[in-house]
UniProtKB/Swiss-Prot annotation:
Originating species: Hahella chejuensis (strain KCTC 2396)
Complex formation: Homodimer.
Enzyme Commission (EC) number: 6.1.1.3
Primary gene name: thrS
Region Catalytic, residue ranges: 242-533
A Pfam family the protein falls into: HGTP_anticodon
Name of the molecule in the record: Threonine--tRNA ligase
Record-level Gene Ontology MF annotations: ATP binding; metal ion binding; threonine-tRNA ligase activity; tRNA binding
InterPro entries, per database record: aa-tRNA-synt_IIb, aa-tRNA-synth_II, aa-tRNA-synth_II/BPL/LPL, Anticodon-bd, Anticodon-bd_dom_sf, Beta-grasp_dom_sf, TGS, TGS-like
């Protein structure tokens, strides 16, 4: 007689074992109709899952995040079924859920075309309308291998053979389609109501370029048509804001095949980069960091001591000189420890905050590269705080304040906080993990910040907090992080003399706010669609003459504003003024100063914004004040 405890605390007693769907029906027919899965004692299960003992149960519907996840997983199976219905020779491989959607990889003799995607999506809709039951079954490994060999599914046979277990394997069927899967899945295909296939791309089997090239079909699925429509609108907006397109249009940067994953910064893009760097440098001084600079190429022995050679060797660019192995640094931390190690430190020196705009390189797979968002050469706003265990919470609290200030200045006010705690394999005692996790949690709580715990997601050497900012499209970008490290200082011999005159190893906090300059600039480009706030804009004001008679006055204004540190562009071309205004507006210049005879006579400027707002005629000093006010408020409204 299982007793089922529901999320509101109420209990329901049953005389026999029941399924999740039985319980939903007992609560009400509406809930039974809406159910896509269940959570039994915190574990996500099928609606057909049998409960034969006391348990806590939550019915999962399309309104729940877990419900949407199940719908997406089942959509991948629906996609595979549709493809094999139209193209029987296509072999299925894997079809996982990804952020906002799903994909499935197929082995097929030719690439799928856009017309193919239309047909496949129509078939998916047909199969959804058929409302086919989705059923779970178990097979032994040998039975499964035999079945999929008969079906000609070589990739599934390989997957099954690679599973290190003799236990029965679970399979899901709908109609005549069957797939190996842990589940859970929706109870019937009719639950998959809002989906869209988005694109097709090539993908190597198991991500290895030595293996066969497969066809990967991407799609998105949601709990209802309204959410799907909203998502497709966001995608359309994201495409309009693609930093690669805008970067090219505004002449900010380019990338080319001869230097994959490396950025060619153009004048305006480099100006933007420098504005950000100068801003961050000023903030570092304000928050008592010491800026350092360390070598880019370091001998293998240091990377072996730090552990990077063993764990990241394949991601490092290496070279040789005079029979010695060197690596271009993929990160800055081991070099920062070397700076700390110069001279014997005292507890009075702690906390010591060392910062670097560190140029790093990682040998990312070429298929993973994506504009500024995923590169091989990048600069981190990196810093490492050497402190005692007792100082962790205070230092993390100060860092959070620093991070909030920076994000607000760049126009980001919504931040998501996630605390990753100890994994199974780790270094350090439980006592120091307890202290460190509590210090991070207490630092977040002291600021009144909501945070989510990610159990087991910390690095082997310490827990961390990740900070993700939300952009204007509601997308999350994980940029900031603060990471406790118990391992590296000891591995590299970092020590300080305590107040008891005993040599101790400091704790090291890895921290970054922007993450990398390149990726952060990509985020800014998309967030602002290239229309940067005045303080960031490569050109803050364009001075436009109406005729040649005003050229000298325009040059004079340009000199005055340049001398005050503003970024000015003179446009003295013999073009119609409306043409100039349109061109600089399209180039997203925040302010346009139009100069005609009247402005020369009154020693003023006619100011308008890129939005077309006429700010009227103002003196040079009044315009300077306007620009200064824009600088002062930065991106804050």
């Amino acid at each position: 007689m299982p007793v089922i405890t529901l999320p509101d605390g109420s209990k329901r007693e049953f005389s026999n074992p029941v399924t999740v769907l039985d319980v939903a029906a007992d609560i009400g027919p509406g809930l039974a109709k809406a159910a896509v899965a269940g959570k039994v004692d915190g574990t996500l299960v099928d609606c057909s899952h049998v409960i034969d003992k006391d348990a806590e149960l939550a019915i999962v519907t399309e309104r729940d995040a877990e419900g949407v996840e199940v719908i997406r997983h089942s959509s991948a199976h629906l996609l595979a079924m549709a493809v094999q219905s139209i193209f029987p020779s296509a072999q299925v491989t894997i079809g996982p859920v990804i952020e906002d959607g799903f994909y499935y990889d197929f082995a097929f003799e030719r690439p799928f075309t856009p017309d193919d995607l239309v047909k496949i999506e129509e078939k998916m809709q047909e199969l959804s309308d058929a409302d086919l039951p989705v059923t779970r079954s178990l097979m032994s490994r040998s039975e499964a291998v035999e079945l999929f060999k008969k079906m000609g599914e070589e990739y599934k046979v390989e997957i099954i053979a690679s599973i290190p277990t003799e236990e029965n394997l679970s399979f899901y069927s709908q109609g005549d389609f069957i797939d190996l899967c842990r589940g859970p899945h929706v109870p019937s295909t009719g639950k998959i109501k809002a989906f869209k296939l988005t694109k097709v791309a090539g993908a190597y089997w198991r991500g290895d370029s030595n293996n066969a090239m497969l066809q990967r079909i991407y799609g998105t699925a949601w709990g209802n048509k309204k959410d799907l429509k909203a998502y497709l609108h966001r995608i359309e907006e994201a495409e309009k804001r693609d930093h690669r397109k805008i970067g090219k249009k505004l002449g900010l940067f380019h990338m080319q095949e001869e230097a994959p994953g490396m950025v060619f910064w153009h004048s305006d893009g480099w100006t933007l980069y420098q504005v950000i760097e100068q801003y961050m440098r000023k903030q570092l001084r304000k928050h008592d960091y010491k800026e350092i600079k360390t070598p880019q190429v370091v001998e293998r022995t240091l990377w072996e001591k730090s552990g990077h050679w063993e764990k990241f060797r394949d991601d490092m660019f290496t070279t040789q000189s005079e029979d010695r192995d060197f690596a271009i640094k993929p990160m800055n931390c081991p070099c920062h420890v070397q700076v700390f190690n110069q001279g014997l430190r005292s507890y009075r020196d702690l906390p010591l905050r060392l910062a670097e705009f560190g140029s790093c390189h990682r040998n990312e797979a070429s298929g993973a590269l994506h504009g500024l968002m995923r590169v091989r050469g990048f600069t981190q706003d990196d810093a490492h705080i050497f402190c005692t265990e007792e100082q962790i919470q205070e230092e993390v609290g100060k860092f959070i304040d620093f991070l909030h200030e920076v994000y607000a200045d760049f126009g980001f006010s919504e931040i998501i906080y996630k605390l990753s705690t100890r994994p199974e394999k780790r270094v350090g005692s439980d006592e120091i993990w307890d202290k460190s996790e509590k210090a991070l949690a207490d630092a977040l709580d002291a600021k009144g910040l909501p945070w989510e715990e990610l159990p087991g997601e910390g690095a082997f050497y310490g827990p961390k907090v990740e900070f993700s900012l939300k952009d204007c499209l509601g997308r999350l970008w994980q940029c900031g992080t603060v990471q406790v490290d118990f391992s590296m200082p000891g591995r590299l011999g970092a020590q300080y003399v305590s107040d008891e005159q005993v040599r101790k190893t400091p704790v090291m906090l890895h921290r970054a706010i922007l993450g990398s300059f390149e990726r952060f600039i990509g985020i800014l480009i998309e967030h602002y669609e290239g229309a940067f706030p005045s303080w960031l804009a490569p050109t803050q004001v364009a001075i436009l003459n109406i005729t040649d008679k005003q050229a000298d006055y325009c040059k004079k204004i340009g000199e005055i504003l340049n001398d005050k540190g503003f970024r000015v562009r003179l446009d003295l071309r013999n073009e119609k003024i409306n043409y100039k205004i349109r061109e600089h507006t399209l180039n997203r210049v925040p302010f346009l100063a139009v100069v005609g005879d009247k402005e020369v006579e009154t020693q003023c400027l006619a100011i308008r914004t890129r939005q077309g707002e006429d700010l009227g005629v103002m003196s040079i000093s009044a315009f300077e004040e306007l620009l200064q006010n824009e600088e002062a408020k930065r991106s804050r409204s």
